[in-house]
A protein has these predicted regions:
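Conserved catalytic-core segment of nucleotide-activated headgroup transferases in glycan assembly
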Residues: 14-18, 130-269, 276
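Extended catalytic core of nucleotide-activated donor transferases of GT-like folds
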Residues: 3-128, 143-148, 451
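Structural motif corresponding to alpha-helix initiation and N-cap regions
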Residues: 37, 71, 95-96, 207-210, ...
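Short loop/turn segments at strand-loop or loop-helix junctions that form parts
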Residues: 7-9, 49-60, 162-169, 226-229, ...
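Catalytic binding pocket for nucleotide-activated donors in carbohydrate/polymer assembly enzymes
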Residues: 8-11, 16-29, 33, 86, ...
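Acidic carboxylate-rich catalytic motifs and surrounding loops in phosphoryl-/glycosyl-chemistry enzymes
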Residues: 34-40, 88-91, 197-209, 294
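C-terminal amphipathic helix plus adjacent low-complexity
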Residues: 150, 316-454, 458, 468
Length: 471
């Protein structure tokens, strides 16, 4: 039996793109068994899978203080596995930490959205026998197109002409990191002057997640964008730390003033750009894309699949013509959908079939057996968004007060030990889920869970599968 373990880092706040990525292995890998393991949940012991996959949300913990502890948790599982595969993203942040991890874990394959200047990011790994290959930041599948298409309004009936949400990254990552946001803001200002209705923001308070983002995009005729990424490497996060300290001490500094205070004279530079999953999201929603002229994919052409913007700042008058011509914009939308969505080229199924071929994961036509190492812990949460934070808070308070064993004894005796007045609101839930709460306590006491498992709102892959099935 070909057994693949997928180590992920899904949380309650995970973006849909992250969820789709983690679930794609269970849906599309076509091996005999897939076990999903949250890095903050139970780590299987005494198993020897054929392959282990580390998703990019797991590797994103490299910027957290608990990274080394998480590595120690999963290293025995990795070392028991012959085929070791990693899928990093945003490689330019804390890349030295990744490079050291890939080398020490004897990673076999690394799939990254960045396909140039890899020796700058990974000097140790590229000098060894680790194989690097390209992976996009996101792909499409049937669930993606069916789920998001329901929010797409007819093009002529959409209320907003131009819409976008984009992060304005700090200057320590170079000019490339700010390019997408700056282009969006500048073009929105020009479009507004031309009489178009615009809602473009780089503010964190305006972030739209999940269905709210797709409802917004599905009611927008045009969106503006560019490749994401960076042009400066922050090997161990020291530049990011300096930015945080400067912001704390000087909260009124502009981005330009902040950049002037950073010493970027001896930093490592390169082209660390990648195509954003927004291209697929916009196509799925039937939104016409206005993009910085660039090479996105072979055959993806300006004026045919997207409306181009030139980097010099001047806007071709034909851009305004397209924005005023619903029929012409519709032709570009349909062409982009045909290119991005209606072939197998950018599907998870095709990509993961290629990954399996390159890494030696044996494929089968049989139905994949899907399991989750922490599924029984997630049962107590159910469909309520309030239960998990309360449960984690309750158990954390019990640990800090040194009464966890007493809480356990009371639960086993059929009683609920309330630690503060707000706990009374959950009495009924505790009454019906006593045995499941005891599993959390046992998990912590046995070492299957760590204190961060009671702080970070992590979720199992199976819980997201259940919620998608229920829609």
């Amino acid at each position: 039996m070909t057994h693949v373990v997928v180590i992920h880092g899904l949380r309650t706040s995970s973006r849909q793109t992250n969820v789709d990525n983690v679930l794609s292995f269970s849906r599309n890998l076509r091996c005999q068994k897939v076990t999903n393991v949250n890095v903050l949940g139970r780590i299987p012991r005494h198993v020897s899978p054929d392959a282990v996959i580390l998703t990019y949300d797991t590797l994103a913990f490299r910027t957290w203080p608990i990274w080394n502890q998480l590595v120690n948790r999963i290293m025995p599982l990795i070392e028991s596995t012959p085929v070791r595969i990693a899928f990093p993203q945003d490689d330019y942040t804390n890349c030295q930490i990744l490079d050291e991890f890939f080398s020490s874990a004897k990673m076999k394959h690394v799939y990254s959205p960045i396909n140039s200047d890899l020796e700058v990011l990974y000097p140790q790994s590229t000098s060894r026998s680790i194989r690097f290959a390209e992976a996009l930041t996101g792909y499409v599948d049937d669930n993606f197109t069916k789920r998001e298409a329901k929010f797409s309004r007819p093009f002529a009936l959409r209320k907003l002409d131009l819409g976008q949400r984009v992060r304005l990254l700090d200057p320590h990552l170079g000019s490339r990191a700010a390019q997408k946001a700056e282009i969006a803001v500048q073009f929105a200002a020009a479009a507004k002057d031309m009489g178009f209705s615009c809602d473009v923001s780089t503010s964190p308070k305006d972030v739209l997640l999940g269905e709210n983002w797709f409802q917004f995009l599905g009611n927008t005729r045009f969106t503006v964008g560019a490749k994401g990424g960076a042009s400066i490497v922050d090997p161990r996060g020291k530049l990011a730390d300096k930015v945080r300290r400067l912001r704390a001490r000087h909260p009124h500094l502009s981005r330009r003033e902040l950049g002037d205070r950073l010493n970027l004279s001896d930093v490592m530079c390169g082209d660390f750009s990648a195509v954003s999953p927004r291209l697929f999201e916009a196509a799925a929603m039937g939104t016409c894309q206005i993009l910085l002229r660039d090479h996105y994919f072979d055959g993806f052409e300006p004026w045919r699949h997207y409306v181009p913007l030139d980097s010099g700042g001047a806007i071709d008058p034909r851009v305004w013509k397209v924005m005023r011509d619903i029929d012409l914009a519709g032709e570009i939308v349909r062409a982009s959908q045909a290119f991005l969505l209606e072939t197998e080229r950018f599907t998870y199924a095709k990509f993961l079939a290629q990954v399996a071929l390159e890494t030696g994961i044996e494929q089968t036509n049989e139905k994949t057996i899907i399991s989750d190492s922490s599924a029984d812990l997630d049962v107590v949460v159910g469909n309520s968004s309030l239960i998990l934070p309360w449960l984690q808070s309750y158990l954390s308070r019990a640990i800090l007060r040194g009464v966890l064993k007493r809480v356990e004894r009371e639960l086993k005796a059929g009683r609920f030990m309330k630690l503060n007045d707000s706990d009374s609101d959950y009495s009924d839930h505790v009454e019906t889920n006593r045995d499941k709460i005891l599993k959390w306590i046992d998990g912590f006491q046995s070492g299957d869970l760590i204190i961060e498992s009671l702080v970070v709102p992590w979720r199992t892959a199976s819980s997201f599968m259940s919620s998608l099935t229920a829609r």
